[in-house]
From Swiss-Prot:
Residue numbers annotated as active site: 138, 166
Gene behind this protein: dapA
Keyword Cytoplasm: yes
Lineage: Bacteria, Pseudomonadati, Pseudomonadota, Betaproteobacteria, Nitrosomonadales
Involved pathway(s): Amino-acid biosynthesis; L-lysine biosynthesis via DAP pathway; (S)-tetrahydrodipicolinate from L-aspartate: step 3/4
EC number assigned by the record: 4.3.3.7
Reaction catalysis annotation: L-aspartate 4-semialdehyde + pyruvate = (2S,4S)-4-hydroxy-2,3,4,5-tetrahydrodipicolinate + H2O + H(+)
Family matches, as Pfam families: DHDPS
Assembly notes: Homotetramer; dimer of dimers.
Protein's UniProt name: 4-hydroxy-tetrahydrodipicolinate synthase
Binding-site residues, pyruvate: 50, 208
An individual GO BP term: lysine biosynthetic process via diaminopimelate
Transferase in keyword set: no
Length: 296
């Protein structure tokens, strides 16, 4: 089991900038990565759910990974979303990430086809055996239906090349069980912003964050405070962020967070169908959460 010791803290699940017609805006992506690094973001997670991975094609997916790795230039780790509900496609995307120079692949639990726990084990083991790139598992049953059980995750933690897990269940009992059972050095990341602070206090390595798209400095400072045991500062940051954690999900992610990024002038407002722009009635809801965090 390899170790990604550098990928610790606030890792942004970065949005994919697009023009009004849905074309990729690579220039905006490069500027966005520079801004995140300036703001203290500890790592870039490219082409995940928040990056609209379901609606980019294979060539675009690889192009986005290459662009992120090139722009980051080794300043922060780049973790590439490489998951698919086809094992062969997941292998191909992971190989693309390896060739681009990403530090790791983030592979979501296969969605729609509802594999068994043994199927999940074989899927991930096959990817790890096929590609020489550290692999982080990603469990988000609210989207995938299939749920990677802790027993299966612990079993996979022993497979060479599988180095971590993003847990988006928000279940602290499950998180505590994982922290207790996985090998030392196996990286555990919260995939749920609202419970990221308790997750880290239990022993997690950080958060792969939607909220960090608009509040990177606060998310970074919260992580630093948590790791240093400065609970007063960690709570202060978390209190400022809490409305964002909920209001950035008033419609399906990444609809609200892309609107918020555009509101801050970071990106153009484009999305790809079937995602549509944030409903007008939700604009002030998200804006109020941004004001609470003193972003505007």
């Amino acid at each position: 089991m390899a170790e990604i010791s550098t990928a610790r803290g606030s890792l942004v699940a970065i949005v994919t900038p697009m023009s009004d017609d849905g074309a990729l805006d690579l220039g905006a992506l490069r500027r966005l990565i520079d801004w995140h690094i300036e703001q203290g973001t500890d790592g870039i997670v490219i082409v995940g759910t928040t990056g609209e991975s379901p609606t980019v094609n294979f060539d675009e997916h690889c192009l986005l990974i290459r662009t992120a790795v090139e722009q980051a230039g080794g300043r922060v780790p780049v973790i590439a979303g490489t998951g698919a509900n086809s094992t062969s496609e997941a292998i191909a995307l992971t190989e693309c990430a390896r060739a681009a120079g990403a530090q790791a692949g983030l592979s979501v639990v296969p969605y729609y086809n509802k594999p068994t726990q043994e199927g999940l084990y074989q899927h991930y083991r096959k990817i790890a055996e096929a590609v020489d790139l550290p692999l982080i598992l990603y469990n988000v049953p609210g989207r995938t239906v299939a749920d990677l059980a802790n027993d299966t995750a612990v079993r996979l933690a022993e497979v060479p090349g599988i180095v971590g897990l993003k847990d988006a269940t928000g279940n602290m009992e499950r998180a505590a069980d994982l922290v207790r059972r996985v090998p030392k050095g196996f990286a555990l990341y919260s995939g749920d912003d609202a419970s990221a602070l308790p997750f880290m206090l239990l022993g997690g390595h950080g958060v792969i964050s939607v909220t960090a798209n608009v509040a990177p400095r606060l998310m970074h400072e919260m992580c630093v405070a948590a790791f240093e045991g400065n609970l007063a500062r960690a709570r202060e940051c978390n209190d400022a962020l809490l409305p964002l954690h909920s209001k950035l999900f008033v419609e399906a992610n990444p609809i609200p967070v892309k609107w918020a990024c555009a509101e801050l002038g970071l990106i153009p407002p484009g999305l790809r169908l079937p995602l549509t722009p944030l409903s007008g009635g939700q604009h002030e809801v998200v804006r109020a959460a941004m004001r609470h965090a003193e972003l505007i």
